[in-house]
């Protein structure tokens, strides 16, 4: 059996919703750490975090509806959606376009997460 590894990168980070946006902002010196605005932090010691931005007004924001219907999103943990999108990006980035079921079956993705429900 011949073994082949085709690599691609997929990222959903506090800097952007793909590798290109994240890398460009990183090189620019931007930080993904910002004040937490999505919930009340008055009783918490930490007031800042690196969160995934979903605001339409923000450059490079993650737009989950572009990947999965809202009804389907409610059925899975948010971290699973982020992992699936990053995996899809990685396969696309690799340039691997399997044309038959045999090649599709041989396709795999390795996912890493610093924290979350993966």
Regions found by a protein language model. Name each.
Residues 1-118:
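Conserved "HGTGT" condensation-loop signature of ketosynthase/thiolase-family condensing enzymes
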